[in-house]
Amino acid sequence: MKLEEIKKFVAELRGLSQEELAKKENELKKELFDLRFQAAAGQLDQTARLNEVKKQIARVKTVQSEMK
C-alpha cells in the first residue's frame, strides 16, 4: 500500500464505530487465515498480501485502542 492509501484507510477506520471496527478486524483475520492456507498449499501468488493484511489488522487494533 502506498502512503496515500494507508492514510485513506486509517481515516476510514476512524469514522467507524467500535462494532464496525470489530467486524472489520474479523474480516481481515478470516482473510489472513485463507491466505495462510493458500500459502501452505502452494497456491498463493501474491505473497506480499500476507504482510499487508497483518499490517491492516494492526491498524484496526490501533484505532480501536485510540477510541478507548
Swiss-Prot record:
InterPro entries: Ribosomal_protein_uL29, Ribosomal_uL29, Ribosomal_uL29_CS, Ribosomal_uL29_sf. GO terms for cellular component: cytosolic large ribosomal subunit. One of its GO terms (biological process) is translation. One of its GO terms (molecular function) is structural constituent of ribosome. Keywords: Ribonucleoprotein, Ribosomal protein. Gene3D superfamilies: 1.10.287.310. SUPFAM superfamilies: Ribosomal protein L29 (L29p) (SSF46561). Belongs to the universal ribosomal protein uL29 family. This is Large ribosomal subunit protein uL29. The lineage of its organism: Bacteria, Bacillati, Bacillota, Bacilli, Lactobacillales.
